Amino acid sequence: MNFEFEREIGFINSQPSLAECLTSFPPVGDTFQSSSIKNSTLSHSTLIPPPFEQTIPSLNPGGHPRHSGGGRPKASPRARSGSPGPAGAPPPPEYPWMKEKKASKRSSLPPASASASAAGPACLSHKDPLEIPDSGSGGSRRLRTAYTNTQLLELEKEFHFNKYLCRPRRVEIAALLDLTERQVKVWFQNRRMKHKRQTQCKENQNGEGKFKGSEDPEKAAEDDEEEKALFEQALGTVSGALLEREGYAFQQNALSQQQAQNAHNGESQSFPVSPLTSNEKNLKHFQHQSPTVQNCLSTMAQNCAAGLNNDSPEALEVPSLQDFNVFSTDSCLQLSDAVSPSLPGSLDSPVDISADSFDFFTDTLTTIDLQHLNY
């Protein structure tokens, strides 16, 4: 009793590990351990090991099965099935499905994934499957699903009509194409992402095309502005030239009127001579002018008739002169010819020609519309 009590106290204080607890019990499994070893050696002597389990490194223990103290019954089936042969046994043969694996395969591979990888190429398409690392477990790898042309065609048809599948339709397609529901769901997810990338690329290309197209209207607008500037510049030069011509004609007309007025006011005795000389000069000047200048002069004459030159008293009376256009050009010329040569004799004639009427005729000759004059 004292020995057992001290042993319990020491067990509680020391807190031994599980192995020490197992060794504290009396050895019961010596006969079982020897029998399990004998059975394992006998099983390897037959030389009919299961090839699949021997080729997986994770199922092959490094040495004899370790049994601490007494062997447990749960470890015996694993020792029987996966215990290695003797040291001089030949290595297991390599199968074709082993060569398809990558050389950098890790030693830890669960039996479920191994069995799925073994059955995967047989139940899927004729294409060589490719392995991709599984994100869930670092060491385990799963095979990439390779779809046949028929499966891809049917899936593409369904995706054309429906981007998203309800669960009953997904189950129906999976049963029709001999696929799992998860494979159909993953394929549709990937296809939606691909469709999204394609649409984004098209939008970017369209945006770049619009940006390039927007540059051309800017250039066209700049060209239009340049053309407008050139047109306005040319129009300004032409209008300036026309204004200069009109101003020159207006100055000539005003000068002739000023000379006539000065002759009438300053030299009362010689008034018949000076207006006639100025009139003859104007007539000679008009005969040598071009049609463009004649039009300009006619325009300026009309402006004078409208009262542009408000300084001279004759211009104020010009609107009333338009009523006297009934005189023909021949009569006016005959009148001027009749007055100019026989000017001294006209003083003694019974017809009384006053200075005002003579000045009126000279003003009429200088301001008449040139379109009615035929020289």
Swiss-Prot record:
Region entry Disordered, spans: 29-142, 193-223, 255-277
Compartments in which it is found: Nucleus
Keyword Transcription appears in the UniProt entry: yes
Motif placement: Antp-type hexapeptide: 94-99
An annotated Gene Ontology molecular function: RNA polymerase II cis-regulatory region sequence-specific DNA binding
Compositional bias (Basic and acidic residues): 209-220
Matching SMART domains: HOX (SM00389)
CDD domains, A to Z: homeodomain
Compositional bias per record (Low complexity), positions renumbered to this chain: 76-86, 106-124, 255-265
Cross-referenced InterPro entries: HD, HD_metazoa, Homeobox_Antennapedia_CS, Homeobox_CS, Homeodomain-like_sf
Pfam families: Homeodomain
UniProt biased composition (Polar residues): 31-46, 266-277
Domain of life per record: Eukaryota
GO biological process terms held by the UniProt record: regulation of transcription by RNA polymerase II
Function: Sequence-specific transcription factor which is part of a developmental regulatory system that provides cells with specific positional identities on the anterior-posterior axis.
Xref: PANTHER family: HOMEOBOX PROTEIN HOX-A2 (PTHR45664:SF3), PROTEIN ZERKNUELLT 1-RELATED (PTHR45664)
Family, per entry: Belongs to the Antp homeobox family. Proboscipedia subfamily.
Name of the protein in question: Homeobox protein Hox-A2
Source organism per UniProt: Gallus gallus (Chicken)
Primary gene name: HOXA2
